Regions:
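Active-site anion-handling motifs in enzyme catalytic cores
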Residues: 1-365
Protein backbone atom coordinates (compact mmCIF):
# COMPACT_ATOMS: atom_id res chain seq x y z
CA UNK A 1 0.00 0.00 0.00
CA UNK A 2 1.17 3.52 -0.84
CA UNK A 3 0.06 6.51 1.23
CA UNK A 4 0.49 10.22 0.53
CA UNK A 5 1.42 12.10 3.72
CA UNK A 6 0.33 15.73 3.77
CA UNK A 7 1.38 18.31 6.36
CA UNK A 8 3.52 21.39 6.89
CA UNK A 9 6.61 19.37 6.02
CA UNK A 10 9.91 20.56 4.60
CA UNK A 11 9.26 24.12 5.79
CA UNK A 12 11.90 24.20 8.53
CA UNK A 13 9.46 23.97 11.45
CA UNK A 14 10.78 21.65 14.15
CA UNK A 15 7.33 20.81 15.48
CA UNK A 16 5.97 19.74 12.11
CA UNK A 17 9.15 17.81 11.31
CA UNK A 18 8.67 16.01 14.63
CA UNK A 19 5.09 15.16 13.62
CA UNK A 20 6.36 13.69 10.35
CA UNK A 21 8.99 11.67 12.21
CA UNK A 22 6.33 10.40 14.63
CA UNK A 23 3.97 9.53 11.76
CA UNK A 24 6.69 7.58 9.95
CA UNK A 25 7.56 5.85 13.23
CA UNK A 26 3.90 4.83 13.75
CA UNK A 27 2.98 4.03 10.14
CA UNK A 28 2.40 0.29 9.54
CA UNK A 29 5.44 -1.39 7.99
CA UNK A 30 3.41 -2.47 4.95
CA UNK A 31 2.78 1.16 3.97
CA UNK A 32 5.12 2.93 1.54
CA UNK A 33 4.98 6.68 2.31
CA UNK A 34 5.08 9.51 -0.23
CA UNK A 35 5.63 12.84 1.53
CA UNK A 36 4.46 16.21 0.22
CA UNK A 37 7.29 18.57 1.17
CA UNK A 38 8.47 22.14 0.77
CA UNK A 39 12.01 20.74 0.51
CA UNK A 40 11.73 17.27 -1.04
CA UNK A 41 15.47 16.56 -1.14
CA UNK A 42 15.93 17.39 2.54
CA UNK A 43 12.88 15.33 3.52
CA UNK A 44 14.01 12.39 1.39
CA UNK A 45 17.58 12.48 2.74
CA UNK A 46 16.50 12.84 6.38
CA UNK A 47 13.80 10.17 6.45
CA UNK A 48 14.79 7.90 3.54
CA UNK A 49 11.37 8.27 1.91
CA UNK A 50 10.00 9.41 -1.43
CA UNK A 51 9.17 13.12 -1.29
CA UNK A 52 7.61 15.41 -3.89
CA UNK A 53 7.09 19.20 -4.09
CA UNK A 54 4.00 20.14 -2.12
CA UNK A 55 3.16 23.04 -4.47
CA UNK A 56 3.47 21.10 -7.73
CA UNK A 57 -0.11 20.23 -8.63
CA UNK A 58 0.95 17.82 -11.38
CA UNK A 59 3.33 15.97 -9.04
CA UNK A 60 0.73 15.81 -6.27
CA UNK A 61 -2.02 14.52 -8.59
CA UNK A 62 0.40 11.96 -10.02
CA UNK A 63 1.26 10.79 -6.50
CA UNK A 64 -2.42 10.48 -5.61
CA UNK A 65 -3.07 8.40 -8.74
CA UNK A 66 -0.30 6.01 -7.73
CA UNK A 67 -1.45 5.72 -4.11
CA UNK A 68 -4.10 3.98 -2.05
CA UNK A 69 -4.40 6.35 0.91
CA UNK A 70 -4.09 10.04 1.81
CA UNK A 71 -3.23 11.19 5.33
CA UNK A 72 -3.34 14.64 6.91
CA UNK A 73 -0.24 14.11 8.99
CA UNK A 74 -0.77 15.94 12.26
CA UNK A 75 -0.86 19.52 13.49
CA UNK A 76 -3.15 22.50 13.07
CA UNK A 77 -3.60 22.21 9.31
CA UNK A 78 -7.22 23.33 9.16
CA UNK A 79 -6.98 26.82 10.65
CA UNK A 80 -7.24 30.25 9.07
CA UNK A 81 -5.61 32.32 11.82
CA UNK A 82 -2.27 32.49 10.00
CA UNK A 83 -3.66 32.38 6.46
CA UNK A 84 -7.00 31.75 4.76
CA UNK A 85 -5.08 29.70 2.19
CA UNK A 86 -4.32 26.91 4.69
CA UNK A 87 -7.82 25.37 4.71
CA UNK A 88 -8.10 25.79 0.95
CA UNK A 89 -4.83 23.91 0.35
CA UNK A 90 -5.21 21.09 2.85
CA UNK A 91 -8.98 20.81 2.52
CA UNK A 92 -8.78 20.89 -1.26
CA UNK A 93 -6.28 18.03 -1.34
CA UNK A 94 -8.38 15.98 1.08
CA UNK A 95 -11.49 16.42 -1.07
CA UNK A 96 -9.50 15.58 -4.21
CA UNK A 97 -8.19 12.39 -2.62
CA UNK A 98 -11.73 11.43 -1.60
CA UNK A 99 -13.07 12.10 -5.11
CA UNK A 100 -10.27 9.90 -6.50
CA UNK A 101 -11.37 7.07 -4.22
CA UNK A 102 -8.40 6.95 -1.85
CA UNK A 103 -8.77 5.88 1.75
CA UNK A 104 -8.44 9.11 3.77
CA UNK A 105 -7.34 9.80 7.34
CA UNK A 106 -7.24 13.07 9.31
CA UNK A 107 -4.50 12.13 11.79
CA UNK A 108 -3.67 13.84 15.10
CA UNK A 109 -5.34 17.08 14.11
CA UNK A 110 -5.83 20.29 16.04
CA UNK A 111 -8.85 21.92 14.42
CA UNK A 112 -9.11 25.71 14.30
CA UNK A 113 -9.30 28.57 14.76
CA UNK A 114 -11.72 28.70 11.84
CA UNK A 115 -12.86 32.30 11.55
CA UNK A 116 -14.25 32.25 8.01
CA UNK A 117 -17.51 30.47 7.09
CA UNK A 118 -15.83 28.92 4.03
CA UNK A 119 -13.05 27.46 6.21
CA UNK A 120 -15.64 25.97 8.56
CA UNK A 121 -17.65 24.49 5.69
CA UNK A 122 -14.60 23.02 3.96
CA UNK A 123 -13.23 21.49 7.16
CA UNK A 124 -16.58 19.95 8.06
CA UNK A 125 -17.04 18.57 4.55
CA UNK A 126 -13.55 17.08 4.39
CA UNK A 127 -13.80 15.44 7.81
CA UNK A 128 -17.28 14.07 7.14
CA UNK A 129 -15.94 11.79 4.41
CA UNK A 130 -12.73 10.62 6.12
CA UNK A 131 -12.34 6.92 6.87
CA UNK A 132 -10.59 7.72 10.15
CA UNK A 133 -10.15 10.85 12.28
CA UNK A 134 -8.02 11.50 15.36
CA UNK A 135 -7.54 14.78 17.21
CA UNK A 136 -5.05 15.89 19.85
CA UNK A 137 -7.09 18.19 22.11
CA UNK A 138 -10.48 18.34 23.78
CA UNK A 139 -11.59 21.51 21.99
CA UNK A 140 -11.14 19.86 18.59
CA UNK A 141 -13.01 16.78 19.81
CA UNK A 142 -15.86 18.97 21.09
CA UNK A 143 -16.12 20.77 17.74
CA UNK A 144 -16.26 17.47 15.85
CA UNK A 145 -18.90 16.23 18.28
CA UNK A 146 -21.00 19.29 17.37
CA UNK A 147 -20.54 18.31 13.74
CA UNK A 148 -21.62 14.74 14.60
CA UNK A 149 -18.26 13.40 13.42
CA UNK A 150 -16.80 10.56 15.49
CA UNK A 151 -13.11 10.83 16.28
CA UNK A 152 -10.34 9.46 18.46
CA UNK A 153 -8.96 11.85 21.09
CA UNK A 154 -5.35 11.22 22.13
CA UNK A 155 -2.28 13.30 23.10
CA UNK A 156 -0.04 14.71 20.37
CA UNK A 157 1.97 11.91 18.66
CA UNK A 158 5.27 13.66 19.47
CA UNK A 159 4.84 12.34 23.02
CA UNK A 160 5.72 8.97 21.50
CA UNK A 161 8.60 10.14 19.29
CA UNK A 162 11.96 8.52 20.02
CA UNK A 163 14.65 10.92 21.24
CA UNK A 164 18.31 11.15 20.20
CA UNK A 165 21.24 12.56 22.22
CA UNK A 166 22.56 16.05 21.47
CA UNK A 167 26.31 16.28 21.07
CA UNK A 168 27.92 18.75 23.47
CA UNK A 169 24.79 19.37 25.53
CA UNK A 170 26.18 17.83 28.70
CA UNK A 171 29.38 19.87 28.35
CA UNK A 172 27.40 23.09 28.89
CA UNK A 173 27.09 24.48 32.42
CA UNK A 174 24.20 23.19 34.51
CA UNK A 175 21.46 23.73 35.51
CA UNK A 176 19.94 24.63 32.15
CA UNK A 177 16.72 26.43 31.21
CA UNK A 178 15.36 26.36 27.64
CA UNK A 179 13.51 29.25 25.98
CA UNK A 180 11.49 28.59 22.80
CA UNK A 181 9.82 31.75 21.47
CA UNK A 182 8.34 32.64 18.09
CA UNK A 183 7.32 35.88 16.39
CA UNK A 184 3.70 36.91 16.73
CA UNK A 185 1.85 40.24 16.48
CA UNK A 186 1.01 39.99 20.19
CA UNK A 187 4.69 39.56 21.08
CA UNK A 188 5.33 43.26 20.49
CA UNK A 189 8.84 44.77 20.51
CA UNK A 190 8.14 46.20 23.97
CA UNK A 191 6.98 42.84 25.30
CA UNK A 192 10.03 41.14 23.81
CA UNK A 193 12.30 43.71 25.46
CA UNK A 194 10.52 43.19 28.78
CA UNK A 195 10.90 39.44 28.40
CA UNK A 196 14.62 39.72 27.61
CA UNK A 197 15.15 41.93 30.66
CA UNK A 198 13.32 39.42 32.84
CA UNK A 199 15.40 36.53 31.49
CA UNK A 200 18.62 38.40 32.30
CA UNK A 201 17.42 39.06 35.85
CA UNK A 202 16.26 35.45 36.22
CA UNK A 203 19.64 34.19 35.06
CA UNK A 204 21.56 36.45 37.44
CA UNK A 205 19.43 35.22 40.34
CA UNK A 206 19.69 31.50 39.52
CA UNK A 207 23.00 31.05 37.73
CA UNK A 208 21.39 28.88 35.05
CA UNK A 209 22.64 28.38 31.51
CA UNK A 210 19.97 29.60 29.08
CA UNK A 211 19.40 27.54 25.93
CA UNK A 212 17.63 29.56 23.23
CA UNK A 213 15.83 27.14 20.91
CA UNK A 214 14.44 28.46 17.59
CA UNK A 215 12.00 25.75 16.46
CA UNK A 216 11.63 27.41 13.06
CA UNK A 217 14.94 29.23 12.55
CA UNK A 218 13.75 31.27 9.56
CA UNK A 219 11.22 32.89 11.90
CA UNK A 220 12.50 32.32 15.44
CA UNK A 221 16.25 32.83 15.12
CA UNK A 222 16.03 36.63 15.10
CA UNK A 223 14.25 36.54 18.48
CA UNK A 224 16.83 34.14 19.90
CA UNK A 225 19.64 36.41 18.71
CA UNK A 226 17.94 39.49 20.19
CA UNK A 227 17.73 37.79 23.58
CA UNK A 228 21.29 36.48 23.32
CA UNK A 229 22.58 39.98 22.58
CA UNK A 230 20.72 41.35 25.61
CA UNK A 231 22.11 38.62 27.87
CA UNK A 232 25.61 39.41 26.62
CA UNK A 233 25.14 43.14 27.25
CA UNK A 234 23.88 42.43 30.77
CA UNK A 235 26.63 39.85 31.41
CA UNK A 236 23.96 37.75 33.07
CA UNK A 237 25.53 34.36 32.41
CA UNK A 238 26.17 31.59 29.87
CA UNK A 239 23.77 31.04 27.00
CA UNK A 240 23.69 29.04 23.81
CA UNK A 241 21.49 29.07 20.68
CA UNK A 242 20.48 25.57 19.56
CA UNK A 243 19.20 25.31 15.97
CA UNK A 244 18.62 21.58 15.57
CA UNK A 245 17.22 20.06 12.37
CA UNK A 246 16.75 16.45 13.54
CA UNK A 247 13.40 16.14 15.38
CA UNK A 248 14.68 13.34 17.60
CA UNK A 249 17.61 15.50 18.72
CA UNK A 250 15.28 18.43 19.29
CA UNK A 251 13.32 16.25 21.69
CA UNK A 252 16.50 14.88 23.24
CA UNK A 253 17.66 18.41 24.04
CA UNK A 254 15.02 18.69 26.75
CA UNK A 255 16.42 15.68 28.61
CA UNK A 256 19.23 17.94 29.74
CA UNK A 257 17.02 20.87 30.77
CA UNK A 258 15.49 21.70 34.17
CA UNK A 259 12.81 24.12 32.98
CA UNK A 260 11.35 25.36 29.69
CA UNK A 261 9.68 28.67 28.89
CA UNK A 262 7.80 28.01 25.67
CA UNK A 263 5.56 29.67 23.13
CA UNK A 264 6.04 26.82 20.67
CA UNK A 265 3.47 24.08 21.21
CA UNK A 266 5.88 21.25 20.51
CA UNK A 267 8.52 22.76 22.77
CA UNK A 268 6.05 22.24 25.62
CA UNK A 269 5.16 18.72 24.42
CA UNK A 270 8.80 17.66 24.10
CA UNK A 271 9.87 19.27 27.37
CA UNK A 272 6.99 17.77 29.33
CA UNK A 273 7.60 14.35 27.76
CA UNK A 274 11.24 14.45 28.86
CA UNK A 275 10.43 15.34 32.47
CA UNK A 276 11.12 19.06 32.29
CA UNK A 277 9.16 21.74 34.16
CA UNK A 278 7.17 23.82 31.66
CA UNK A 279 5.96 27.42 31.66
CA UNK A 280 3.66 28.40 28.77
CA UNK A 281 3.46 31.72 26.94
CA UNK A 282 0.31 31.32 24.86
CA UNK A 283 -0.46 32.99 21.54
CA UNK A 284 -2.91 30.38 20.22
CA UNK A 285 -5.70 28.06 21.42
CA UNK A 286 -3.46 25.01 20.99
CA UNK A 287 -1.02 26.38 23.58
CA UNK A 288 -3.92 27.21 25.90
CA UNK A 289 -5.16 23.65 25.41
CA UNK A 290 -1.93 21.93 26.40
CA UNK A 291 -1.46 24.31 29.34
CA UNK A 292 -4.92 23.43 30.62
CA UNK A 293 -4.59 19.71 29.93
CA UNK A 294 -1.25 19.44 31.78
CA UNK A 295 -2.06 22.14 34.39
CA UNK A 296 0.93 24.22 33.29
CA UNK A 297 1.46 27.74 34.62
CA UNK A 298 1.88 30.55 32.13
CA UNK A 299 0.50 33.70 30.55
CA UNK A 300 -1.54 34.49 27.49
CA UNK A 301 -0.33 37.20 25.13
CA UNK A 302 -3.86 37.86 23.94
CA UNK A 303 -7.16 37.50 25.82
CA UNK A 304 -8.67 36.43 22.50
CA UNK A 305 -6.54 33.29 22.59
CA UNK A 306 -8.17 32.11 25.80
CA UNK A 307 -11.65 33.15 24.73
CA UNK A 308 -11.33 31.17 21.51
CA UNK A 309 -10.34 28.06 23.44
CA UNK A 310 -13.15 28.52 25.91
CA UNK A 311 -10.81 29.02 28.86
CA UNK A 312 -11.09 32.74 29.46
CA UNK A 313 -9.45 32.77 32.88
CA UNK A 314 -7.14 29.75 32.67
CA UNK A 315 -3.96 31.67 31.81
CA UNK A 316 -3.58 35.21 33.18
CA UNK A 317 -2.54 38.09 30.90
CA UNK A 318 1.13 38.62 30.13
CA UNK A 319 2.58 41.03 32.75
CA UNK A 320 3.67 44.49 31.66
CA UNK A 321 6.84 44.69 33.78
CA UNK A 322 9.97 42.54 33.87
CA UNK A 323 10.16 42.21 37.71
CA UNK A 324 6.81 40.39 37.72
CA UNK A 325 7.97 38.03 34.98
CA UNK A 326 11.22 37.35 36.80
CA UNK A 327 9.58 36.76 40.19
CA UNK A 328 7.03 34.36 38.69
CA UNK A 329 9.77 32.34 36.98
CA UNK A 330 11.89 32.30 40.15
CA UNK A 331 8.96 30.95 42.16
CA UNK A 332 8.26 28.28 39.57
CA UNK A 333 11.94 27.37 39.24
CA UNK A 334 12.19 26.92 43.02
CA UNK A 335 8.84 25.28 43.72
CA UNK A 336 7.30 24.06 40.45
CA UNK A 337 6.95 20.44 39.47
CA UNK A 338 7.43 18.50 36.27
CA UNK A 339 4.95 15.80 35.32
CA UNK A 340 5.39 12.62 37.31
CA UNK A 341 6.81 9.52 35.56
CA UNK A 342 3.34 7.96 35.70
CA UNK A 343 1.78 11.03 34.06
CA UNK A 344 4.42 11.01 31.31
CA UNK A 345 3.91 7.30 30.70
CA UNK A 346 0.15 7.78 30.51
CA UNK A 347 0.45 10.57 27.94
CA UNK A 348 2.97 8.55 25.91
CA UNK A 349 0.92 5.35 25.97
CA UNK A 350 -2.20 7.22 24.90
CA UNK A 351 -0.31 9.00 22.09
CA UNK A 352 0.18 5.58 20.49
CA UNK A 353 -3.58 5.37 20.05
CA UNK A 354 -2.89 7.40 16.88
CA UNK A 355 -0.81 4.42 15.71
CA UNK A 356 -3.74 2.09 16.34
CA UNK A 357 -6.00 4.34 14.25
CA UNK A 358 -3.60 4.07 11.31
CA UNK A 359 -3.47 0.27 11.47
CA UNK A 360 -7.20 -0.20 11.97
CA UNK A 361 -8.19 2.24 9.21
CA UNK A 362 -5.64 1.20 6.59
CA UNK A 363 -5.92 -2.53 7.32
CA UNK A 364 -9.34 -3.16 8.88
CA UNK A 365 -9.80 -6.58 10.49
Amino acid sequence: MRAVLCGYYGMGNGGDEALLAALLQMLPARVVPVVLSGNPKETSDRHQVEAIPRKSLSAVVSALRRSDAFIWGGGSLMQDASSALNPAYYGGLMLLAQIMGLKTIAWAQGIGPLNQPFSQWLTRRALANCDGVSVRDRNSAALLHQWQRTCLLAPDPVWGLDYAPVEGLWDLPAPRVAVALRPHPQLTPQRLKTLAQALASFQKATGVCLLLVPFQPTKDLAIAQFIANHLTEQRSGPHHIYSLTQPQQLKGLFRGVEMTIGMRFHALVMAAAEGCRCFAVSYDPKVDAIAQNLSLPGWTLSPLASETSGNVSFLPPFPADSPTLCKTWLDFYANGDALSPDQIQSQTDRAFMHQDLLSETLFPP
